[in-house]
Structure formats: structure tokens, C-alpha cells
From Swiss-Prot:
Keywords: Cytoplasm, Ribonucleoprotein, RNA-binding, Signal recognition particle. The lineage of its organism: Archaea, Thermoproteota, Thermoprotei, Desulfurococcales, Desulfurococcaceae. Its main location: cytoplasm. The gene is srp19. One of its GO terms (molecular function) is 7S RNA binding. InterPro entries: Signal_recog_particle_SRP19 (IPR002778), SRP19-like_sf (IPR036521), SRP19_arc-type (IPR022938). Gene3D superfamilies: Signal recognition particle, SRP19-like subunit. Belongs to the SRP19 family. GO terms for biological process: SRP-dependent cotranslational protein targeting to membrane. This is Signal recognition particle 19 kDa protein. It comes from Aeropyrum pernix (strain ATCC 700893 / DSM 11879 / JCM 9820 / NBRC 100138 / K1). It is found in: Cytoplasm.
Length: 112
């Protein structure tokens, strides 16, 4: 739940940096381990690249960085840094990304 306010975002644009962790969208995790969306809005074990792609489809700039999620520190994971306008809340961003992530997961299931 870390967000930093900076003048420069991931690609040099202005806005607010929002940190998104794949655990926010993982339907296999309980909320106490970091899931931030309802189970039916999540996907099982989302990949950081898919979360970043979902953020881009939702209209945000996104960059994947190496880091470990504090609640699951023993797992080496990556985080997604999203550049967001000041007037958009983190909750709204998470919901928008979750919606796009479900579409990506559904398309992947259809291809398999």
C-alpha cells in the first residue's frame, strides 16, 4: 500500500506513482495476505507482466520493477509502478486494472 508523490513518473511524465502488487489481484490469496479485490474480480496467480498490461489497457502508464511484497517477503516477486493522475484514487485504479486483468485471463483461457 505504498504510493509516492513525485513530479516524475515511470517514464518521466507528471502524476502520482502508485505501487500495485500482483497479490492485490490473486484470487487464491486471502485478504489478510494482501488480496485487495473480491475473489470473483481476481485471477489465480497473476503475472506481473499481465498486471502491467492490464494497467496499460486501463489507460495508465505502467512499469514492472523487481521487489518483494512486504506481506509475502519470502517470495521474490515484482511490483508494478503505475503513473496516475492526482484525482484518481488507488482503489479506482485497482478496480480498473482488475477488470482488464480478468479480460486478459479470459482471452488466455480461450486460446488454451
Amino acid at each position: 500500500m505504498v504510493f509516492l508523490r513525485e513530479k516524475e513518473g515511470p517514464s518521466g511524465g507528471s502524476g502520482r506513482r502508485i505501487i500495485l502488487w500482483p497479490a492485490y489481484f490473486d484470487s487464491t490469496l486471502p485478504r489478510r495476505l494482501g488480496r485487495r479485490v473480491p475473489r470473483d474480480m481476481g485471477v489465480p496467480s497473476p503475472k506481473p507482466e499481465d498486471v502491467a498490461e492490464a494497467a496499460r489497457r486501463a489507460g495508465f502508464e505502467a512499469v514492472v520493477e523487481e521487489s518483494s511484497y512486504p506481506r509475502l517477503w519470502w517470495r521474490v516477486r515484482r511490483r508494478i509502478v503505475v503513473l496516475a493522475p492526482e484525482d484518481v484514487s488507488k482503489t479506482d485504479i485497482i478496480k480498473a486494472v482488475a477488470t482488464e486483468l480478468r479480460k486478459i485471463a479470459a482471452a488466455r483461457r480461450k486460446r488454451s
